Structures are given as structure tokens and as C-alpha cells.
Amino acid sequence: MKKQLDKITPRNIDFSQWYTDIVLNTKLASYGPVKGTMIFRPYGYRIWELIQKYLDEEFKKVNVDNVYFPLLIPESLFNKEKDHIEGFSPEIATVTRVGQKKLEENLFIRPTSEVVMMDYFSNEINSYRDLPLIYNQWCNVMRWEKTTRPFLRTSEFLWQEGHTIHSSYNEAENFCLKILNIYEKFAKEILLLPVICGKKTEKEKFAGAKDTYTIESLMFDGQALQCGTSHFFADNFTKVYDIKFQNKENKLEHAYSTSWGVSTRLIGALIMTHSDDNGLVLPSKISPIQIQIIQIKNTEQIDQVVENIKDKLSDYRIDVDNSDKSFGFKISEAEIKGIPIRIEIGPRDLENNQITISRRDQQENKIKIDYKDVKKVVDQMIKDYDLSLYNSALENRKNRTFKANTIEEYIEILKQNQGFVLVPFCGRVECEQDIKTKTATNSRCIPFDQKEVKAKCFNCKKDTCLQVIFARAY
């Protein structure tokens, strides 16, 4: 195990290599046979299953139905929405043959499912009584990426994509924001990511959307990561796909739609926010194993105590290591997996009716407790552990958040720091493209939580009342 730890490059020497080393050495994933693909190993997929479980429960509270739609989309169907096809065309993988036979029409491997779902909705809806339709699917999508990295940016990835149809503009927009609130709560309370909620600029919004809302997080190295988006289309898509319904006044009206999604890049966010040079550090609610019990020696008495402890801690996901591996190996294995709580028990502990317990983020602070008190101690320790992870991430964000009023100030900040930079910005697409050309950065969001200002755009000097976060991003 020490050899395994030696393979993790220190974070402060090469953050990118550290991240890759964490992914590979903690056995979350391996590289796939095709460039840009990856193999989910069991431990990594268990994290994704927990993400699915938590989100699916929240979706069902707002009447979301799970469905599954085809992977292949006819080119003619995709081409109906001009902005949409232009936004995705560089990334679309296309099937042109079956065996040696050329297909009559190209088939796109879905980069997202708006078009195929809209086509379905157009045949499904007649009256306002049929609405809303609120669908979600857990699936894979493909976007042919040039630069790839496990979890963060792969050509094929797993995600959930929700698609809804509503009878009114306000209902659709409100549902779009309701989903964003679910994402925010999930990110903060389950993943312990102190995300910022806001709206995307005109340049950064989703192709074909009226508005795109986002949750943005800052990684340990100061680069931003988009963790989830919710798109409000108004009637942009429904007009293209002629999705009409008979309203309460018996008049035909175009419906209103939304889409929203998060992906396996959330696992990348977990790694880059919480982990350290010794391996993963996982929030308790998303850790496949919440408590690791390590038996220093295997005796009948110790086995009985371990079973008793498991009964007391039955609310938690527990793994017992009673293998013949060395004690040091067992400790290192629990450490590299990021297991929140570690309990050690051996003959000497048993003599005193004690166990030794420690947290993944404070491994040197081992404490001995009466094993009869284990439930009370673990409950509090888990709360303290999660709070500590969240506060550490929040402190990193605060320390890496800056303000600039001119492009010169902004460039100077970028030379010295990585992080969020709050600037007055006009919001124009041309201006943002100019900023990207000058600095290789882009806007992350227009934060909801801001006071209206009267200022000059930090780049073009036009009047503005917006403050926008810019950053380098994954």
C-alpha cells in the first residue's frame, strides 16, 4: 500500500497529475480502449449509484417520471433546431454504415436528448390536461472531446437529463428554478460543495435556451467547475417541433419546455475539492463505505464485539477488514479510499472495553472510547467531519475570490492567483469573446446573490448594472 501512496504526486507540485493519480490509484476508474472513454471500477460506480439514489428521491418529490429514450437520433430530426445543431456539431459522433451498407440517413449518437424527446412530446400532447410532462432519464451520452480527463471531460459520460413540457411560461420557468434548488441543496448538503447559483451569460447559455441557470464550484487549485445546469427554453423548442396544446380557452398554444442535468463530473468535483496527498477524502453521505472497522487480531471475542458494534451502527455503510493483511496496509487502504471514520479493535482494546476511533481528515487524532458509546460518538464525529469538509472548501473559495473593475486589474489578478473574479460586465457576446481572446477565461455565472450596481463594464466600458463571475475553468 505504501507503494500505492508513493504513486500519488503531491498536490502542490502538479495538481493535474495528482488528480489523475488519485483516480487511478484509488481504483475509481481506468482508461477505456478508445481515447476519451473510461471504465468505471466498482468503487467509482458505487459513488455514482449513491448520487443517483439521492437525486432520484428528490426528483420523485416533484413528480419526475424516469424514462429511457433511444441512443440514435436521425440527422433530419436533429437539424430542425438550428442553434442546437450548431452548438453541438463539432462534438457529434455519427453512424453512417451498418456492416458494409451505407445508411440512407446519418444517425447521431445522442449528445443530449432534447430533440428526440421533443419529437415524442409533439405526438403525445393534445390538451392542457395532458400537462405537465416531467421526464428524466439516467443514461450515457457522447460528445467527442479533444482534451479529456477522467470524470471531468470524457467523450462518453453518464448523466441524468430531465425534460419537461408545461402549459405556461411561468410554470416552466419556476420548475426550471425548482430543479436548480434541488441541485444546490444536493451539492451543499450531500457533496459538501459550497456552490454559487446564478444565470449564464448570453454567450455561455445552452444552445437554443432562453436562459440557463447553473451551480458553479471552485476547486482546490482555484479553477471553476460547472456542476449542474437547468435550462429554460420558453417556447423555442416547442415552436420548432410544433408542440401545441388546446388551452383552457379552447385555443391552440405552443407549450413551454425545460431541460436539466448533472453528470459524473460531480465525482471529479468531489476529488478536486476534498481529497489530499494520501488519497480520497469523501463526504460521509456519498462515501460507499462510511465506517471501516479494522480487526488487529481475529479472535472469537473480537468477532463478537465487532458484530455488536455493527448492530449499534446499522444506519451506516460499514466494512469490516479482518483479512490477514498487515495492520499498516489496512490503515493505508482505508485512508486512500477516503473512508470517513475508522475504528480499530485489538486484544488490548478488548481488555479495557475500548475501541480506537479516528476521522479521515484528522487521522493523527485517534481517540479511545468505551465501545458501548460508539453510536453516540460516531454520530457526532460524522457531523463534525462533514462540517469540517464543507468549511474547508468554503474557506478555499473565500480566499480565492477577488474583485476587479478594469481589464488591467483582472489580468493582474490572473497572473498572481487562480480563483473567482467578480467584475462589472455588460453581458454582450462580442465583449465576452474579446475577454476570452485576451485572457483564456470565460464567465461562470451572474450570481443570484448580488446587489444592483451602476458601473462601467470592466472590458468595454459600456454602462452596466451586472456583476459577473469570471474564472479559468475545467
From Swiss-Prot:
Molecular function GO terms recorded: ATP binding; proline-tRNA ligase activity
Keyword Nucleus: no
Gene Ontology annotations for the cellular component aspect, listed alphabetically: aminoacyl-tRNA synthetase multienzyme complex; cytoplasm
UniProt cross-references to InterPro entries, sorted A to Z: aa-tRNA-synt_IIb, aa-tRNA-synth_II, aa-tRNA-synth_II/BPL/LPL, Anticodon-bd, Anticodon-bd_dom_sf, Pro-tRNA-ligase_IIa, Pro-tRNA-ligase_IIa_arc-type, Pro-tRNA_ligase_II_C
Domain of life: Bacteria
CDD domains per record: ProRS_core_arch_euk (cd00778)
EC number annotated for this UniProt entry: 6.1.1.15
Annotated keywords: Aminoacyl-tRNA synthetase, ATP-binding, Cytoplasm, Ligase, Nucleotide-binding, Protein biosynthesis
Assembly mode: Homodimer.
Descriptive protein name: Proline--tRNA ligase
Organism (species): Mycoplasma mycoides subsp. mycoides SC (strain CCUG 32753 / NCTC 10114 / PG1)
UniProt lineage: Bacteria, Bacillati, Mycoplasmatota, Mollicutes, Mycoplasmataceae
Record gene name: proS
